[in-house]
Amino acid sequence: ESFNGRSFSITEKIEGETIARKILRDTTWDLARENFILDSAKALAAIHRLEESHFPKVNLETTSNPLNSLEAIYDALDDPHPTFELAFRWLKKNRPKPTGISFVHGDYRLGNLLFSDNGLKAVLDWEIAHFGDPCEDLGWMCVRAWRFGGDGSVAGISDYETLLESYRRESGRTISIATLKWWEIFGTLRWGVICLQMGGDFRTERTRSLEIAAIGRRVAENEDDLLIALEEQGI
C-alpha cells in the first residue's frame, strides 16, 4: 500500500560515502579511486544487461533518438543560447552509429555512487533510468561538471582508454574514443539544457527553491565546457 499515492521501493540501507570531492581528494579513498574504473565497468555492464522483463511493474521510456528529444526540450524553453545551438549542429553532423538499445541508468556519476574505502558499494538515484544507447552512461561519466575539479577525463579519476578497455572486457562491446567523446559532448549539452530549464522554472516562479536557482546559474559553466570540448574537436 502506498503512503503517498505513488509507487515506491524499499531498499537495503548501505553505509558509505557519496561526496565527490572527498572521494577525489581524501587519502581514505585512495583504494576506491584505484578500483573505480574496473568497478564502474562491471556495474555498467551489469546494468546494461538488464532487460524489460526485470521491471514488470515499471513503465520505462525508450529513447531511440535522445538528441532530437533534447532539442525539442531546448526549443520549447524559447531561450536561445548560441553555444548550445553550435553544439546541436556539431552533434547532428557527427552523430555516431547507435550501439544498440539497453537499459540505461541515465545519471551514472560521482555523487550518485556510494563508496566504501575499497571501492564501489552501490549505485543510487535511478529515477531517470530508461532504455537507450549504453554509451549515454559512459559519456555522462566524462562530462566536465562531473569531474569535480579532478584531472582525469573520466569522473576526474581516469582516462578514456582505460574506461573503454575495462568496459569492453566486462560487456563485450567495443566503443571508440570518438563515439565516447560524442556522448560526452551530448551529456554536457544535456546538463546545460537541464540547468537552463531549472533557471526558467525559478524565474517564472514554478519553483522558489534556492537550489534550483543555483543550478540555473550554471548554464554559463556548461557553455564554457562545450566551447572547450568543441575546440578540442577542431571547431
Annotate each PLM feature.
Residues 47, 89-142:
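Active-site acidic catalytic loop and adjacent metal/ATP-binding pocket
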Residues 1-98, 119:
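ATP-binding pocket architecture of kinase catalytic cores
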Residues 58, 174-186:
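All-alpha amphipathic helical-bundle segments outside canonical DNA-binding/catalytic cores
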Residues 213-235:
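Regulatory N- and C-terminal appendages and interdomain linkers associated
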